[in-house]
Amino acid sequence: GILSLFTGGIKALGKTLFKMAGKAGAEHLACKATNQC
């Protein structure tokens, strides 16, 4: 029903945000490691 659609959307959004944050974090660590921030 509506609720399962809603929770599915929340989960998908969370996954996307987590991926984006992970990518940004990795890039930040890489620039820190090479002193290019």
UniProtKB/Swiss-Prot annotation:
Tissue/organ expression: Expressed by the skin glands.
Cellular compartments annotated: Secreted
Record's keyword terms, sorted: Amphibian defense peptide, Antibiotic, Antimicrobial, Disulfide bond, Fungicide, Secreted
Presence of keyword Disulfide bond: yes
GO biological process: defense response to bacterium; defense response to fungus; killing of cells of another organism
GO CC annotations, alphabetized: extracellular region
Cystine crosslinks: 31-37
Entry keyword Secreted: yes
Superkingdom of source: Eukaryota
Function: Antibacterial activity against Gram-positive bacterium S.aureus and Gram-negative bacterium E.coli. Has activity against C.albicans.
Protein family: Belongs to the frog skin active peptide (FSAP) family. Esculentin subfamily.
Identification of the protein by name: Esculentin-2L
Annotated organism of origin: Rana luteiventris (Columbia spotted frog)
